[in-house]
Amino acid sequence: MKNAVHFGAGNIGRGFIGKLLADAEVEVTFADVDAPLVDQLSHKQEYKVKVVGTECQIDTVTHVTAVNSASEDVIDRIVKTDLVTTAVGPNVLDIIAKTIATGIAKRFAAGNDKPLNIIACENMVRGTTHLKGEVYKHLDESLHSKADELVGFVDSAVDRIVPPAEAANDDPLEVTVESFSEWIVDEQQFKGEIPDIAGMEKTNNLMAFVERKLFTLNTGHCITAYLGCLKGHRTIREAIEDPSIHAEVKQAMQESGEVLIKRYGFDRDMHNAYIEKILGRFANPYLVDEVDRVGRQPIRKLGANDRLVKPLLGTIEYGTENKTLLKGIAAALKYTNDTDPQAVEQQNSLKEVGVKKTLATYTGLAENSAEVTQIETLYNQL
């Protein structure tokens, strides 16, 4: 395998997926709508990644280029490529689906019958399966059976904290990432040969890993942010080093962890060690990760399949403790940020219809449920 088209040349794209692909000697073409970024990447054809942890190192990623994702160039690349990956954010998948569909149709028309694998690397459950549904809406029905045969839509779970670049840095392409990374793919969904990429782990039980990451890293991260905001902390590190927040975030992750242990049979001691590792990652002194970055888009994060309500539904299913998860949801409702449209919309909803109706709308929980009543009580105490 030689070539990949990666949608999304942002920090995750460059600092995580693009880097792993390039390290595996894959030639990566980034596709993005940010014209200055595309120009710089296509001109320099390399960038630096600062990996920070107990030891810091700077790696140079080479053999990369970039095209505008709204251009014909990206479609021509899809015709010939071996792999398509994305790190664009869940909301943008629907936008790029048409481009991918056009590329697949043109690929078939050009007589390229080699398998093509597509992996969406997003913070969403079964994101690639969602993308497939959107791509097929734009793909002529006569091509669906051929696409079923030749195009693998491979779901994945991804985990690496990549904060925005520091404003003081004069290299706009440099990106800072933590040393930890996890990219797990569903080996059952590939077509043809599975690419050999160091750092890409294969599993036949992806949902266990998707939910482990969602219920632990994502749940803990956003509760750290929302509790941190309430106490005036600016960064995730400041918030998690506050003893009361640390204790509550750990408790919330243990509550969601109980669901994982019951659902997937995870070993309790190993899962507790995973929780401790994540708490350590939040406290990484080399990562400046602002609570507003982690807390933004609260409406999406309160969705029934997302990081707060999905583990809560699991605790209801198994009859296990959930008081700290409920507090995390109450804290999410308290989140204010004038620059985030979802935060503004949420605050307007709370003013207009109150806590219970807002919760029912965003979470799908019944307005008269015990959980919604408890969240309202906690909200009024915060």
UniProtKB/Swiss-Prot annotation:
NCBIfam families reported for this sequence: PRK02318.1-2, PRK02318.1-3, PRK02318.2-2, PRK02318.2-5
Pfam short name (any one): Mannitol_dh
Any single Gene Ontology cellular-component annotation: cytosol
Protein family membership: Belongs to the mannitol dehydrogenase family.
Keywords: NAD, Oxidoreductase
GO molecular function: mannitol-1-phosphate 5-dehydrogenase activity
Protein EC: 1.1.1.17
Gene: mtlD
GO biological process, one term: mannitol catabolic process
Residues forming coiled coils: none
Gene3D superfamilies linked: N-(1-d-carboxylethyl)-l-norvaline Dehydrogenase, domain 2, NAD(P)-binding Rossmann-like Domain
Top-level lineage group: Bacteria
Database matches in PROSITE patterns: MANNITOL_DHGENASE
UniProt protein name: Mannitol-1-phosphate 5-dehydrogenase
Catalysed reaction, written as an equation: D-mannitol 1-phosphate + NAD(+) = beta-D-fructose 6-phosphate + NADH + H(+)
Positions bound to NAD(+): 4-15
